[in-house]
Amino acid sequence: MNILITGVGGPAGRALVSQLATTSHNVVGVDMQEVALADIDSFELVPAANDPDMINQLASLVDHYDVDLLIPTVADELPMVAKASQLGQLSNAQVVISPLEAVEKCFDKLLTMRALREAGVSVPPFGVPSDFTSAYDVFEQLGVAIITKPRVARGGRGFAIHTSPEKFQLESYDDSYIIQAFAPGEEFAPMVYVGDQPGNETVSIVAKTQEEFCETAAPIVRSVDTANALDVALLAVKACHALKLKGPIDLDVRRMADGHPVVLEVNARFGANSSLAPELLAEVLKSAA
């Protein structure tokens, strides 16, 4: 197959390229910056996700390389790619992405949390700044530690943890941010593949063992036997179904102080750790064959 991967310079894109290196597939990598990768057959520059011409250029590359399978990995481009796929703008390429409505819910962290809560999926207590009357009200409602993060942002950009109402300046945040109770327990990064048939899910669990909260600090990750974190695996699958997601999904889950897991974020794409779960890409390739 001819496979086009977006964002090949990022962690998610590189993880996929490394897995495809030992296959016979022809891999076309695209990125908004020049990337030197030995394991791809072709490379093309594309505009940033917010460029109105991005989809047109992507569609042109799909035609030029006769792409069979398009795998987007850049969070910012997912809504546009999902819409283009829905409208048939990407020729006959199979696009590895969830339905547009599901992608849009995952793109906005507040919409994600609301949809999961309404579906009975465990999430930490949360709100937006206008839901609270003061910093003290935030801590009274959410607990002894809270986090703030932009509703729309990649990775840990804009993330902050707060432990003191005296030092927390609620007035400096508008409703483009979400405020969540901090889950202090072990952190997991479940990866799920949801197939077209009911009950066709593949789940892999990765544990993050480094407590770092700056965007440049890479956590230490390790694979976990699903049987040893069955509640996390079941929660991840339940979240994917609640959001009506399909294909590969990357989640962030933590345990609350009492030990029960909660969903923090859901990314409707392959994540940076997919090389630890090659069975997910195998499912994608099998489905596209």
Annotated model-derived regions:
Residues K246-D258:
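A short glycine-rich, hydrophobically flanked beta-strand micro-motif that places a catalytic Asp/Glu
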Residues A102-G185, D196-P198, L230:
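Active-site nucleotide/adenylate-binding loops and adjacent lid/helix of ATP-dependent enzymes
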Residues P52, L78-P79, G155, G271, ...:
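Short glycine-rich, flexible loops that bind phosphorylated cofactors or substrates
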Residues H162, D174-D175, Q180-K244, R255, ...:
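ATP-dependent carboxylate/phosphate-activation module, predominantly the ATP-grasp catalytic core
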Residues L37-D41, D53-N56, E104-K109, G156-F159, ...:
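Short, charged, surface-exposed secondary-structure boundary motifs
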Residues M1-V96:
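ATP-binding N-terminal substructure of ATP-dependent carboxylate-amine bond-forming enzymes
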